[in-house]
Amino acid sequence: EVVFTSGATEANAMALAGIRPGDLVAASDLEHPSIRENLTLAESRGARVNRLPRADRGIINPHDWAALCTEAPNLQVATLAGHETGAVQDMAALIDATRRRFGDAGAWHIDATQAVGKIPVDFHRLEVWTLSFSAHKFFGPKGVGALLVRRGVSLPPLFVGGGQQRGRRSGTEAVYLAVGMAKALRMAVDDMVDRQIACTQLREGFLAGIAPCKPWEILGPLAGGLNHVLLIAFSGVRSDMALMALDLEGISCSAGAACSSGSSLPSPALALIGLPEEHRKSVIRFSLGPFLNPDEVSMAGSAVAKIIARLRGPHA
């Protein structure tokens, strides 16, 4: 079943709305704020949330995940592709580890917002209960997303009214937004390989551009992750100072997720991936799109290198 929403934030809230006092939830701090904050809210209402203590380079170890709970969790929550690290989780391995530990895979919610339209995603093969995504991540219209719900799964509505969408989400559906999302998704799937190749070339050009300002470290997976996301720690540089300087050069980037850019606090994911505390305020996240000009991306990389070198000073 497809439930059309205003975006992945609402879809995530809808998927987590059924958490009850006393329920046990398995999760991690790799999640998007729209999941983390809803889990914190559930805790305040009496739910128990066990969070994974470590995920090197943003990749969850199936053994560690299965050991997270001593009893079968009522709900397990994971992000298919990390919005900060770009790490892609092996969901089949995680679900299998849970099944072997507790005899049943249990209920799962997957946030696939960064994955849908960029890598192959098959809801039925994932064997999960719910999956969320948002149209703007694959160049569709803003203000629309969806929650995929396995048939037979009951979820309480976030709000009630006219009972549209089989009572899951009341209110008149924005048909034109849904059609725009469907068209954008079809284009993204049809062009997926070409877009992946383009982003890989952009990534290589950008990394070549920033090479002169080493030391820096890519914090996500070195292979097998999303090729358009780069989370980089520039030692000896405060990210807030770098962001201001980069903005003056017309380079758009962030110290974390774009929708959390108003926060001055380092992302909880940085602790989870093992980054020392003294380096957590030196992290910058770059996102590359398949429609960017390769020459401009390479020039942006060179500009980043010059700015980082300037901020480090002559004795760096």
Where are the predicted features?
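Pyridoxal 5′-phosphate
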Residues: 1-316
